């Protein structure tokens, strides 16, 4: 929310933007699951994992365009919504098959333990993700109240889109790591 409000202005509605993800998942998960039914869980997950960096790169494009793509809506908002749509589609490929994949990795009788540990990534990513996001936000998109003029803040936040490059890189590394893991196991 801070990125959107700082870059798109106080009139931005990050709460509304956050509703895009569940809406897209609700509308698309059954369709994607049906399409991927004959494919392996790892194939479906890999497709989703490679969509994640695409999502981040779309979000980075928000302040690249000179004029508004849609009249009356900030490009930051438009590209954020497009990025969230792609991220939600990635979730449609990953989530339905994620627990299936972990249960198939488990030795007989230890499925519950493996399924429990399958959520460890959520814990770790929330800690590291929020920490990294805070550091990057401070570096590339600082709070405007810390500056004497709007021009000084604009100069300090000129590269705010770099934040998304970091997350695209992390997503790409994770996607290749999953491919490598699938080949090894």
Language model: regions and residue ranges:
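Multi-pass alpha-helical transporter architecture, strongest
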Residues: 61-63, 157-185
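Loop-to-transmembrane helix entry/capping segments in MFS-fold secondary transporters
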Residues: 11-12, 77-78, 103-121, 160
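Helix-to-loop junctions at the C-terminal end of transmembrane segments
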Residues: 27-47
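Intracellular juxtamembrane helix-capping segments at the cytosolic ends
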Residues: 4, 92-107
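A membrane-interface helix-boundary motif in multi-pass transporters
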Residues: 135-171
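Loop-to-transmembrane helix entry
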Residues: 2-26, 47, 78-81, 158-165
């Amino acid at each position: 929310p801070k990125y959107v409000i700082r870059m798109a202005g106080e009139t931005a509605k990050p709460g509304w933007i956050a509703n895009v993800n569940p809406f897209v998942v609700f509308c698309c998960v059954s369709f994607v699951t049906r399409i991927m039914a004959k494919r392996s869980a790892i194939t479906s997950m890999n497709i989703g994992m490679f969509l994640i960096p695409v999502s981040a790169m779309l979000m980075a494009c928000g302040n690249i365009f000179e004029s508004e793509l849609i009249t009356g809506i900030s490009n930051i908002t438009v590209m954020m919504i497009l990025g969230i749509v792609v991220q939600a589609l990635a979730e449609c490929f990953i989530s339905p098959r994620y627990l299936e994949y972990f249960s198939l990795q488990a030795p007989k009788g230890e499925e519950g333990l493996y399924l429990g540990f399958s959520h460890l990534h959520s814990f770790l990513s929330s800690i590291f993700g929020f920490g990294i996001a805070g550091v990057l936000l401070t570096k590339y998109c600082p709070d405007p109240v810390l500056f004497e003029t709007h021009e000084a803040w604009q100069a300090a936040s000129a590269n705010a889109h770099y934040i998304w490059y970091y997350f695209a890189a992390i997503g790409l590394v994770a996607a290749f790591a999953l491919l490598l893991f699938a080949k090894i196991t």
